[in-house]
Regions:
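Extended active-site neighborhood of metal-dependent phosphoesterases/phosphodiesterases
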Residues: 8-9, 13, 21, 98-191, ...
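Binuclear metal-dependent phosphoesterase catalytic core
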Residues: 246-332, 374-384, 389-404
Length: 408
């Protein structure tokens, strides 16, 4: 391919919902058509969704009736205010069933906002054992596997960090070609600029056995920039400050635990949904948008006696938490302090599996879909016996507070 780095304030025309900023190398010269899209350096909204990954009738139905309409609605809410909106799908658009690429392109087009794609391990042809060649079907429908574009004041870099071996086997990492390309591209990006780096597998994950190949080389290239990495692959949520200038949003799957039955949570307890980033004159703000909920749905509490292992404590789940957030509680109007963080199993997803086993005879034996036992975004406190009313106040990284109260 030959492609253009789409400048801020413009968008390439879409085919099947995805921007066509590229052309095949079969002519001596190429002309690229771009349309105005907002204002140069102006406001915009971006939605980052990970692991749509449908396989089977139920998964496609839920993706097309729950997830895509939600994305469309949020996108249209921004565009009704003359704020351009687009989305990024962070890989595993399908689940090895690549014959469904034409179908999912048709459904993506119905969202009616531009969708930039990222290639994931399940988007490779499992019958091909060569990394580059195994992406042939993806390229046919979506274009280059790595590229760049601009939006607002931000610079976007999209990477392919799946080293595919064939037959569903792969490693996660970067090759020489892409590292050299990133290094060359950054010569045109001023130091101090803000970058979004989008790739399927995360740069970091709290599972100590995980390692992205050549990740240090990649991160070293971003010295002098402000960087937010957007990734998926794990199907759970993990927001991490990797370096002083680099933060990663490893985003839980929009389908939760692989669209399991009628489930509405990932196996770590994150509701099915996606991240929304708003870019404007004051920089970047973000929130997690749960499907079927408004933007203020950012935490959930569990009364005393409802969480195994914490029976005498009030517990709170804050799925989009990072180290800039605060989780505080009040007793009868008096601030008591911050709640303590703990790692544990999500009571919602765990009870969902229990309920399905008891009432419908469904026994989840697949190890990969069992509840995550070390999700880190839970908080607890032991209220005083005399407290009558408890208020929980969660403050996000942007300084916005969310409140819920309960009788004790």
């Amino acid at each position: 391919f030959i492609y253009v780095v789409t400048p801020s304030g413009y968008m390439a025309p879409c085919n099947g919902g995805t921007p066509v900023f590229y052309k095949t190398l079969n002519e001596n010269s190429h002309d690229f058509q771009l349309h105005r899209w907002g204002t140069v350096g102006g406001k915009y909204a971006m939605m980052a969704a990970a692991d749509t990954q449908p396989r089977g009738e139920n998964a496609f139905h839920r993706l097309e009736t729950e997830a895509f309409p939600d994305l469309k609605q949020v996108g249209f809410e921004y565009m009704s205010q003359n704020i351009p909106a687009f989305a990024i799908f962070l890989g595993d658009i399908l689940w090895d069933n690549l014959e469904m690429f034409p179908h999912i392109k048709q459904e993506i087009a119905k969202i009616q906002i531009p969708i930039y794609p990222v290639i994931g391990n399940h988007d490779h042809d499992k019958e091909v054992s060569d990394d580059d060649a195994s992406a042939h079907l993806y390229r046919h429908f979506f274009g280059p596997t790595y590229y760049a574009f601009n939006a607002g004041k931000d610079y976007y870099i999209v990477l392919d960090n799946i080293l595919y071996k064939g037959n569903k086997k792969y490693e996660v990492g970067l090759n020489d070609q892409q590292l050299n390309w990133v290094k060359s591209y950054l010569q045109y990006v001023p130091k101090g600029a803000h970058l979004f780096v989008c790739m399927h597998a995360p740069a970091y994950f709290y599972n100590e056995n995980y390692k992205l190949g050549r990740v240090a080389e990649l991160l070293d290239l971003f010295e002098g920039y402000k960087v937010d990495i957007l990734s998926g692959h794990t199907h759970v949520q993990c927001n991490t400050q990797i370096r002083n200038n680099i933060r990663e949003y490893n985003i839980a799957s929009i389908g939760g635990a692989w669209w399991l039955w009628d489930g509405i949570y990932s196996k770590d307890g994150t509701p099915i949904g996606y991240q929304v980033f708003e870019s404007g004159k004051n920089g970047i703000a973000n929130y997690f948008k749960s499907l079927g909920h408004d933007r203020d749905y950012q935490f959930r509490y569990y009364p005393v006696g409802t969480v195994p292992g914490h029976e005498d404590e009030l517990c709170v789940k804050v799925w989009n938490w990072d180290n800039r957030w605060k989780v505080e509680y009040y007793e009868d109007g008096k601030l008591k302090g911050e709640m303590k963080q703990y790692k544990g199993m999500d009571p919602d997803y765990d009870f969902f599996l229990q309920r399905k086993a008891v009432t419908e005879g469904k026994d989840m034996k697949e190890r990969g879909r069992q509840a995550n036992k070390n999700a880190y975004f839970f908080f607890s406190t032991k209220p005083s016996d005399k407290a009558k009313k408890i208020k929980i106040v969660v403050t996000d990284a942007n300084g916005k507070s969310y409140e819920q109260s309960l009788e004790h």
